[in-house]
Amino acid sequence: MPSIADKPTVLARACWLAAVGRAELRDEPLPAPGPDEVQVRALHSAVSRGTEGLVFRGEVPASEYGRMRAPFQTGDFPAPLKYGYASVGVVELGPPALRGREVFCLHPHQTRYVVPADAVLPLPPGVPAARAVLAANLETAVNALWDARPGVGDRIAVVGGGVVGLLVAWLAARLP
């Protein structure tokens, strides 16, 4: 009779910053999801050129380590660590209402992962998974506009044509 020890180990491949300026892929065993957890198979993962560039180059100031920590980061700055916060995937295991759903999660770059079920956000109908990875950047753009507090009819100049700058411009163009 098979025992739980006979169950094959599920492996994930994760991107680790092994040392400042050097990334590597590592195989990691996944824990079985608990009753309030999901196992997600990643479809897309976005790299934040600005933030993750700072992390890769070891340029995160020690005073900012706490604020720069990603929700499911493993390891500590400057390295070794597993970093990232823009993953879209499909729930493979977990509560029936989430199984098979495409979801967004603030998770590092990894092929599969287990997180609390309330850490994933199901994608709205019609939102392509490849675009949904921009959710973290869109949140930054929304916060920038909230902080700027534009009024009706204000002219807004966006300096910077990166992903966040383009999203700020896109949102600003839709303001009254």
Language-model regions, residue ranges each:
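Mid-domain Rossmann-like dinucleotide-binding core that forms the NAD(H)/NADP(H) cofactor-binding site
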Residues: 131-176
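Residue-level recognition of beta-strand termini and adjacent short loop/turns
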Residues: 18-21, 34
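Glycine-rich beta-strand-centered segment in the early N-terminal region that forms part
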Residues: 31-47, 55-107
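Glycine/charged-rich beta-loop-alpha catalytic/anionic-binding loops adjacent to active sites
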Residues: 118-129
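Short structural boundary motif marking the start of a folded domain
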Residues: 8-14
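A structural motif shared across PLP-dependent enzymes of the aminotransferase-like
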Residues: 104-117
